[in-house]
Amino acid sequence: GDVYKRQGYAISELSVGQKASFSKTILGADIYNFAGIIGDFNPVHVNAEYAKTTRFGGQIAHGMLTASFISTVLGMALPGADAIFLEQNLKFTAPVHVGDTITATAEIIDMDVKHKILTMKTVVTIQDGTVVVDGQAKIMATKKL
């Protein structure tokens, strides 16, 4: 669910199958701001007229903008505060257009309690359920009880 525990979870409070999500509607301003931060002004992202002429049929979000919401889930919800992002693999499977509502979800699929390492399935979907980013992350849950 969308349970946010800002103080974070200790490894002993977590279990395989636990998951959390974050949703946001992607605005043109989000894409322009992200382009400004990272310096990627590819016209498919920032020029709506040009983007209409591409295979995407319109302006799309940067893949890394879409994927960055995985970090929101991990840092704000599960495991939350004191989480250390160790590793992430990503597969970009479909575009995100201006106005799409994305939902990033992370689910614990394995735990190394001794080393406080979580293996998490990470997925981002849009409003119709289409998977736009698929991946897996390794996170260290360093919060102490």
Regions found by a protein language model. Name each.
Residues 13-28:
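Short amphipathic
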